Amino acid sequence: MTHVEIKKVRDEPSSDDGVRLLVDRLWPRGVSKADAELDGHPKDVAPSTDLRKWFDHDPKKFQEFGDRYRAELDDNDAAHDLAAKLRDERPQQVTLLYGAKDEEHNHAIVLRDWLRDHL
């Protein structure tokens, strides 16, 4: 079974990370591609620009943001393709990398939970 975890993209890469995927639509400032040590950047699974701007990292909006983002993921072919790829390849560990400062209210949490439900 594939374990899906999240981690800040600025945190030190680890051999325990397994497959490292940057799940932000935009490349995080100050992070080089070499330092990120990515296996992929499926930016099409990130929240839409409109949803990201509406949320604006406001913890008070996180519950509704999560509901809206899950609805986007349910209708997103790229998200279903990613889940199918992970089911087929069966990596032991996948680490979703994000650039947000808030570790408790960010889209990677929602995506992690959605992927866990779809693997």
Where in this protein do the model-derived segments appear?
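Residues lining hydrophobic/aromatic ligand-binding pockets adjacent to catalytic sites
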Residues: 1-119
